[in-house]
Swiss-Prot record:
SMART domains: CPSase_L_D3. The gene is carB. Mn(2+) 3 binds at residues 822, 834. Mg(2+) 4 binds at residues 834, 836. This is Carbamoyl phosphate synthase large chain. Large subunit of the glutamine-dependent carbamoyl phosphate synthetase (CPSase). CPSase catalyzes the formation of carbamoyl phosphate from the ammonia moiety of glutamine, carbonate, and phosphate donated by ATP, constituting the first step of 2 biosynthetic pathways, one leading to arginine and/or urea and the other to pyrimidine nucleotides. It catalyses: hydrogencarbonate + L-glutamine + 2 ATP + H2O = carbamoyl phosphate + L-glutamate + 2 ADP + phosphate + 2 H(+). GO terms for molecular function: ATP binding; carbamoyl-phosphate synthase (ammonia) activity; carbamoyl-phosphate synthase (glutamine-hydrolyzing) activity; metal ion binding. One of its GO terms (cellular component) is cytoplasm. Mg(2+) 2 binds at residues 299, 301. GO terms for biological process: 'de novo' UMP biosynthetic process; glutamine metabolic process; L-arginine biosynthetic process. Mn(2+) 1 binds at residues 285, 299. The large subunit is composed of 2 ATP-grasp domains that are involved in binding the 2 ATP molecules needed for carbamoyl phosphate synthesis. The N-terminal ATP-grasp domain (referred to as the carboxyphosphate synthetic component) catalyzes the ATP-dependent phosphorylation of hydrogencarbonate to carboxyphosphate and the subsequent nucleophilic attack by ammonia to form a carbamate intermediate. Residues 930-1028 form the MGS-like domain.
Length: 1029
């Protein structure tokens, strides 16, 4: 069936700020769908509050609304844009839940908007636990024994029947939020109460425990003609009990027999048909009892999911794009496979390699949180690696996570290692180390329930490590031997660690033996047809499938796995660089290891290498492709850390040079440079040892801001107010950070106002692109503070001085590209805190606020264009206020106090735009899911809040200063840091923990009071800007 012509305008809902359980994969999915629908001639309207995404760029959708994802705001967009259809399956759980609300409250019916991609009934059957169980019973597919309960009393009755351990799954929540596995009756009561509260429909499913069973996922697509294809099978390395988003996963499934696979396949076909998903993709999860082969279905997601992104990258099959086209009427056999150009999308992908995904965690950001993994997702990012065997794929994935293969585990006692065999982020490394020590596969399997096949594969890697020492001197290894060793996935660094040589010597010996990798192509068909899409991975075999072209080419290094401090903002910058360089006539080569992102889409760069971002893997590609330039300044700290070694090995780094990066990041040379330029700085010193740190602290006086050099996201940064606090801090840092880092000690400017300044420089001219005023005072990490552009409270004279000083600094450093400078203003003086000669996390926000693609400009500067040629010679002065607010993941980390400090903790951001700064702030707060009340009670705790109280009272809120019994207020402002902050957060009450935040919150509520807030697209804002200028 050809595409529908009765639809003209299609509304797509994004997923909002990046959060745990809902990350960059939805930017990738949404971007793919937007491009596909636009190409088909549809008018596309997007609502998404997250400015750090590619999908919210003004040239993707026809109308882009950076507005809160709430029924009220989406209704306003629908009223204004009058879409014919709503496609809700590309924005994760947020979009699906919102679409269901708009359907239930009559908005869709009122404006004649059709749900496409999945109908309301299919969403209900797939998402509602009771409806799903009933549907499975009807088709004879077994589910875990369980019951949906709607009250604690009902739960207690059913628990008596089913016993412990028991699994609690709230309905309609994201990433397992509010759920868990209860091993004790006390835990059962606590988790069930929380789950009933967290579920938007106040119901939870109680299920028998299937801990230790094997877990599989099938990625399935179905069209209107009832053609169903299985895109891939995915097997969880970790057994049941760990959320699939936190599990190491492998595609295709490795331990299923053909009969078992066909059984899961048949079940999947029956399930997708019964649920009624007939225009898109679904992810179906199964558990298999290894004792008797009993199969039960765990759940399905009737939408594009995190696993869909992984399956797309693993196979080369663009699930989100195909799902969007099926939603507008196409059938699978009508859609061509982009990669082969001869097979239709109805052909199931076949792969002749193994893909491994390893999650990335951030428990170090939340000290005191237990790191046990369960049914609630806790990982903040992930890596993917491709190899010809599981062993090669696993070792490549491990080095992609940027964690040492052995590291601290070699120093641990065997008893301590055994203590790490429960589900936790360090279990894989503990398993490897125990197998090294002869623990044996049966003992490790008994303790972990990890399938013996996986453990025996790891045992083979460990045996090979020992064998390396019996192969004779490494200086005499011949090509064949090198190839056999490298085919197991060993890096040069790991080989060097085993044989006792530096990595560079191992590399030189390997190259002398002519043992270099070949590159294979991801083609969806196991090389049966020619592939036209250049998507590659390395291995050590004979045939190389990748022939470099003669065109001038530039390599762009991606940012690797998302983590707190290095998120989707850096992917945004690298993708913009790709587009800018393609426009300038260069062939672009992307190297990255993150399966969630737009940068690793096969049709973003001219060539994609899905490889670890390590010195060895990057240099192999550079030597293979011979580019004219390598760009390291856009992917965050990961590529920056490689810059110096790459340059020394002959990689042609373009843009800002490694020497400049070093000068800005090395505190002593940076301090000297600022002194030379006469830029005020807080008094500071650099200590090389703990003893020296204590001596310098006594000299500088307290309070001090302390941190190790070369970190991103304020890792291990703290404010210390006494010698005791400093000593505790030093003990922790030297235990946690590799090597012996130098420690920076800076006088802490208590109560100072911070500024973030993004600047472009071509070496001859520097232009400030935007100055952001932080809402929170100094002491809160810049990545966790809300900020407003342009500044609201500072004098024009001071801002002019900051602008001039920033531009002088950029020229003095010799920056060629982007520079981010942070300032602190106290008593009318602007002190420079730090300068980062790279893309910062504010680049997407500033680009959208000032209507200039800064990362594109940086890429053009890197290949020799000047700011004059680009047409960016003056600081833009937008006639609007833009506010960036952050999303904090405290709810996922039980018991952690939700107080902001110098270590970054946020995972994502939202943006609000208005002509009034406080209304922009109000929109940004709603966009970040902080629902500021316009009526009700505000509880204020702490000194210095009289002005806040007066503002809130004038806005009509009742202000109290003591809690009334157990009753929680509608808004909590608590600058004392009391435990009530955590309680309020868990109950969904908006919380504010800083005085500055309290002032902005009160003014925002007052500004919004009695106003009808309209909606305006980003394109309309930018046209308004263009007209004004």
């Amino acid at each position: 069936m050809p595409k529908r012509t009765d639809l003209q305008t299609i509304l797509i809902l994004g997923s909002g700020p990046i959060q745990i359980g809902q990350a960059a994969e939805f930017d990738y999915s949404g971007t793919q769908a937007l491009k596909a629908l636009k190409k088909e001639g549809y008018r596309v309207v997007l609502v998404n509050s997250n400015p750090a995404t590619i999908m919210t760029d003004p040239d993707l959708a026809d109308a882009t609304y950076l507005e809160p994802l709430t029924p009220e705001f989406v209704r306003k967009v629908i009223e204004k844009e009058r879409p014919d259809a709503l496609l809700p399956t590309l924005g994760g759980q947020t979009a699906l839940n919102l679409a269901m609300e708009l359907n239930a409250n009559g908005t869709l019916k009122e404006f004649g908007v059709e749900l496409i991609g999945a109908n309301a009934e299919a969403i209900h059957k797939g998402e509602d636990r009771e409806a799903f169980q009933a549907a499975m019973k009807k088709i004879g597919v077994e589910t875990a024994r369980g019951k949906m309960v709607h009250s604690l009393e009902e739960a207690i009755e059913y628990q008596k029947e089913i016993g412990l351990p028991i699994v609690i799954r709230p309905s309609f929540t994201l990433g397992g939020t509010g759920g868990g596995i209860a091993h004790t009756y006390e835990d059962f009561l606590k988790i069930t109460e929380g789950g009933l509260r967290d579920s938007p429909v106040h119901s939870v499913l109680l299920e028998e425990s299937i801990l230790g069973w094997k877990e599989y996922e099938l990625e399935v697509m179905r069209d209107h003609a009832d053609t169903v294809v299985i895109i891939t099978s995915i097997e969880n390395f970790d057994p049941m009990g760990v959320h699939t988003g936190d599990s190491i996963t492998v595609a295709p499934a490795q331990t299923l027999s053909d009969v078992e696979y066909q059984r899961l396949r048949d079940y999947s076909l029956a399930i997708i048909r019964e649920i009624g998903v007939d225009t898109g993709g679904s992810n179906i999860q199964f558990a298999v009892n290894p004792e008797n082969g009993r199969v039960i279905v765990i759940e399905m997601n009737p939408r594009v999911s995190r696993s869909s992104a992984l399956a797309s990258k693993a196979t080369g099959f663009p699930i989100a794009k195909i799902a969007a086209l099926l939603a507008v009427g196409y059938h699978l056999d009508e859609l061509p496979n982009d990669i082969t150009r001869v097979t239709p999308a109805a052909f199931e992908p076949t792969i002749d390699y193994v893909v491994t995904k390893i999650p990335r965690f951030a428990f170090e950001k939340f000290p005191g949180t237990p790191d046990a993994l369960g049914t609630q997702m806790r990982s903040v990012g992930e890596v993917m690696a491709i190899g010809r065997t599981f062993k090669e794929s696993l070792q490549k994935a491990l080095r992609s996570t940027e964690s040492d293969v052995r590291g601290a585990f070699a120093e641990m006692s065997t008893e301590d290692l055994r203590g790490l065999l429960y589900g936790n982020p360090r279990r894989l490394e503990a398993v490897i180390e125990l197998l090294r020590r002869g623990e044996g596969v049966p003992a490790v399997h008994d303790a972990t329930k990890i399938d013996p096949w996986f453990l025996s594969q790891i045992q083979e890697i460990v045996d090979a490590e020992k064998e390396l020492l019996n192969l004779g001197p490494i200086t005499e290894w011949k090509y064949e031997l090198w190839r056999e060793v490298k085919r197991l996935g060993f890096s040069d660094a790991r080989i060097g660690e085993i044989v006792g040589l530096p990595e560079l010597e191992v590399r030189a010996l390997r190259k002398a033996a002519k043992a270099t990798p070949v590159y294979k192509t991801v083609d969806t068909c196991a090389a049966e047809f020619e592939a036209y899409t250049p998507y590659h991975y390395s291995t050590y075999e004979w045939e190389d499938e990748v022939t470099p072209t003669d065109k001038p080419k530039v390599v762009i290094l991606g940012s690797g796995p998302n983590r707190i401090g290095q998120g989707v903002e850096f992917d945004y910058a690298t993708v913009h660089a790709v587009w800018a360089l393609q426009e300038a006539g260069y062939e672009t080569i992307m190297i990255n290891s993150n399966p969630e992102t737009v940068s690793t889409d096969y049709d973003t760069a001219d060539r994609l290498y899905f490889e670890p971002l390590t010195f060895e893997d990057v240099m192999n590609i550079v030597e293979h492709e011979k580019p004219v330039g390598v760009i390291v300044q856009l992917g965050g700290q990961t590529p920056l850390k490689l810059a110096k070694r790459l340059a020394e090995a002959g990689a042609p780094i373009i843009g800002t040079l490694p020497e400049t990066i070093h000068q800005a990041e090395d505190r002593a040379s940076f301090n000297a440079l600022c002194e030379r330029l006469g830029l005020p700085q807080p008094r500071g010193k650099v200590a090389q040892t703990p003893e020296q740190a204590r001596e310098l602290a006594a000299e500088l006086g307290f309070p001090l801001m302390v941190r190790p050099s070369y970190v991103l996201g304020g890792r291990a940064m703290r404010t210390v107010r006494s010698m005791e606090e400093l000593t505790t801090y030093l003990d922790e840092v030297y235990a946690a950070v590799e090597g012996q880092p130098s420690i920076l000690l800076d006088q802490f400017l208590e109560g100072a106002l911070e500024l973030d300044v993004d600047t472009l420089c071509d070496g001859e001219r520097a232009v400030v692109a935007g100055i952001m005023e932080h809402v929170e005072a100094a002491g809160v990490h810049s990545g966790d503070s809300a900020c407003v552009l342009p500044p609201v409270t500072l004098s024009p004279e001071l801002l002019e001085r900051v602008k001039a000083d920033t531009e002088r600094l950029a020229l003095e450093l010799g920056v060629k590209g982007l520079l981010n400078v942070q300032w602190a203003v106290k008593d009318g003086v602007a002190y420079i805190l730090e300068a980062n000669p790279r893309a910062s996390r504010t680049v997407p926000f500033v680009s959208k606020a000032v209507n200039h693609p800064l990362a594109k400009y940086a890429a053009r500067i890197a290949v020799g264009q000047t700011l004059e040629q680009i047409g960016f010679t003056e600081t833009p002065l937008p006639d609007l206020y833009a506010v960036k607010e952050v999303h904090l993941p405290f709810l996922k980390f039980k018991g952690v106090s939700p107080i902001l400090g110098p270590e970054m903790k946020s995972t994502g951001e939202s943006m609000g735009i208005d002509t009034d700064p406080y209304l922009a702030y109000y929109r940004a707060e709603l966009g970040a899911k902080s629902n500021l009340p316009l009526s009700g009670t505000a509880l204020l705790l702490g000194d210095g809040l009289d002005g806040v109280a007066a503002t809130l009272e004038s806005a009509g809120l009742r202000v109290i200063h003591e809690q009334e019994g157990d009753r929680l207020p509608d808004l909590l402002i608590d600058v004392t840091g009391s435990p009530l902050l955590r309680t309020a957060l868990e109950r969904g009450v908006p919380i504010v923990s800083t005085r500055e935040g309290a002032e902005w919150t009160a003014k925002a509520i007052a500004a919004a009071q009695g106003k009808t807030l309209g909606v305006r697209s980003l394109q309309a804002w930018q046209q308004r800007e263009a007209a004004a200028s």
